[in-house]
Design a protein with these regions (language model features):
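A metal-dependent hydrolase signature that marks the N-terminal structural subdomain at the beginning
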Residues: 1-70, 76
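Active-site scaffold of zinc-dependent metalloenzymes
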Residues: 61-100, 110-126
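Hydrophobic alpha-helical membrane-association signature
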Residues: 27, 99-103
Length: 126
């Protein structure tokens, strides 16, 4: 038997990367409900892995996300790294929780607040 096993409209057809994008989007939308004005113009992105040149403050540990401040004409940007999050997560449910925590931590960095101020449901143990 050759051909598709599942039609493209079935949720199981979606790739892990697509599902991860959805998790990050859900996390961003949840924060935008509270911080809409502060997050206006901020770009959010998902990349598979971080660049090989770590920032000076990253000491040997692979980053799960990164905040890039506005630079000239470029708007501020928050990037979540899919593969490191998936690798660090204990299971598939943990991926969503960890992605949420990464987004909260990076937004906190952007707003110069603690993660708990950004999202009272933030869990440091994620």
């Amino acid at each position: 038997m050759r051909g598709q096993l599942l039609p493209r409209t079935v949720p199981a057809w979606r790739s892990r990367a697509d599902r991860f994008d959805d998790l990050v989007l859900d996390a961003v939308e949840r924060l935008e409900a509270r911080w809409a004005r502060e997050l206006d113009g901020v770009e959010f992105a998902v990349e598979d892995v971080p660049p090989s040149d770590p920032s000076p403050w990253e000491h040997g540990e692979v980053p799960l996300g990164r905040f890039f401040p506005a630079d000239g004409a470029l708007p501020p940007r928050i990037v979540v790294y899919r593969r490191p999050v998936e690798t660090r997560a204990a299971d598939s449910q943990d991926i969503g929780e960890l992605a949420q925590s990464v987004v909260v931590e990076q937004v906190a960095h952007l707003l110069n607040l603690t993660p708990e101020e950004v999202d009272p449901r933030y869990n440091r143990d994620s």
